[in-house]
Each structure stands twice: as structure tokens, then as C-alpha cells.
């Protein structure tokens, strides 16, 4: 798709990671920095600029190795995976701080694509690749990396990309460094599904704040089964009139729930 990123794997042998190194002068990193700086120069007093989407850890490792190859590595060479994961998170602190400092120099909050700003530091951890592995493998290989990356930010909103990632939620929520979670439905997991509503309700009952990407046609049914406390809804609309109508519905929902 046009709104995602693609990569060509470069690691053909887990025992040779010589190609895995970060060059701050590479054209892609410099290009993103230049775009960010240009936006910041035009943003003063007008709008907020976020830093680019960052994917350290297992998703970076999957890009370097290839998802299929990495899946097979868990069977064929599990001892070779930790060095690759370490290489995939090694430079994250420097990169994260570089963007954070750039935003602060221009008086901007710390914010990225999720539009959740922080006056301190904000990060969106994720592990989309974890949809392909078991919870045991997630706990062994992914959690330690998550703990390293989330320790850098004051606020961490975990991006749960679909039901196959959501099966790791209990482990994700054990991390004290993760604040709310953002639940995304898959193509076969729509907001209309009972499974999706039950999952959100289960997380809310556990006291976890939840960001929900919700279709406007699902709002009425959603409000019947959910408590509004701790929710942040993303709802796309077609017009300003529709937006006001949705706001009125949400206000009524909040009043009825608090009474």
C-alpha cells in the first residue's frame, strides 16, 4: 500500500550481521530529518508536527531478515536470533532522542502518527511480526526488547495491530511502562464483530485505557456494550454536520453512563 513501508532483506546468514549498521548520514534518514525540519519551520503557531514512525526490535529484524526466514529461524537457529534483535534496537535510543530533541527545539510536544501528544516523551511500541509467533516466543524474544525501548519514553501507547497480535495482550499489559493500548481490527476482524467488542470490554474491565479505531456505523452498537471511561475514539466522518451529530451522541452517552 501507499501508506506503509517496504524493505528488501539483507541478512542472509544470522552468523554474519556485518551489513546491519546505522549510518546517520544515509539518504533516507537525512531525508526524513529534512522533511521534519521543513515542516517545523512552517508550523510555528499553526500546527503540530510529529516525528516519523519508528519500528525497532522484532519488526526491524523481520525487515532485515525477511518474515518467512525469521519464522524458520525460530526452529532452525533460535540462538542466532538474539544478536539480530539486539542489532535491530541498538541505535533506537539515539534515533528517538534525535527526533525528540528536534521537536523540543521548536516548542513542539512529543507526538507521532497516533496524534497523542506528550509534553514529555511519547513512543508507539509495536510488534506486528508477533502475529506469526506463539506467546511463549513473544515473551522470550520480544518482551525484553520492548522493555528496553519503552524505558526511553514517559508515555508509551502500544499499537496492537489485529487479533493475532492481541493474543499477547496479557504479556503486553504486564509492562508498567505501557500506558494505554490502541486496538486495530483486521480485515476479517471488523468493528462489528462480537470478538472485537468482547476484547475491548475485557481490556477496559482490567482498567486499561483503550484507543479504538471505530467506524461511524458501529458507534450506536458500540455505545450499548461499552463504558465511555478510559476510551479514546477515532471516527472518520464525511461532513461537519456528521461530526456534530456524533459529538451529541457521545455527550449523551457520557451523561447517561455517569448518572
Model-derived regions, located:
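A contiguous, low-structure linker/loop signature
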Residues: 1-16
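Active-site loop segments of alpha/beta catalytic cores
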Residues: 1-3, 22-259
Amino acid at each position: 500500500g501507499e501508506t506503509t513501508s517496504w524493505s528488501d532483506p539483507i541478512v542472509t546468514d544470522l552468523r554474519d550481521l556485518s551489513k546491519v549498521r546505522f549510518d546517520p548520514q544515509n539518504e533516507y534518514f537525512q531525508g526524513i530529518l529534512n522533511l521534519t525540519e521543513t515542516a517545523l519551520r512552517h508550523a510555528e503557531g499553526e500546527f503540530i508536527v510529529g516525528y516519523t514512525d519508528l519500528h525497532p526490535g522484532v519488526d526491524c529484524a523481520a525487515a532485515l531478515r525477511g518474515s518467512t526466514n525469521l519464522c524458520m529461524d525460530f526452529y532452525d537457529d533460535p540462538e542466532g536470533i538474539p544478536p539480530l534483535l539486539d542489532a535491530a534496537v541498538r541505535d533506537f535510543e539515539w534515533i528517538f532522542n534525535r527526533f525528540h530533541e528536534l521537536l523540543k527545539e521548536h516548542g513542539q510536544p512529543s507526538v507521532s502518527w497516533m496524534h497523542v501528544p506528550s509534553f514529555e516523551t511519547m513512543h508507539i511500541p509495536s510488534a506486528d511480526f508477533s502475529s506469526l509467533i506463539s506467546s511463549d516466543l513473544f515473551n522470550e524474544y520480544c518482551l525484553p526488547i520492548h522493555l528496553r525501548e519503552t524505558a526511553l519514553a514517559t508515555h508509551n501507547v502500544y499499537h496492537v495491530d489485529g487479533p493475532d497480535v492481541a493474543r499477547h495482550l496479557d504479556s503486553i499489559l504486564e509492562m508498567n511502562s505501557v500506558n494505554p493500548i490502541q486496538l486495530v481490527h483486521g480485515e476479517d476482524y471488523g468493528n462489528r464483530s462480537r470478538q472485537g467488542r468482547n476484547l475491548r470490554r475485557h481490556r477496559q474491565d482490567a482498567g486499561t485505557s483503550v484507543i479504538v479505531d471505530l467506524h461511524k456505523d458501529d458507534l450506536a452498537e458500540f455505545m450499548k456494550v461499552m463504558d465511555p471511561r478510559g476510551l479514546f475514539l477515532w471516527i472518520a466522518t464525511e461532513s461537519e454536520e456528521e461530526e456534530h451529530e456524533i459529538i451529541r451522541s457521545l455527550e449523551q452517552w457520557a451523561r447517561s453512563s455517569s448518572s
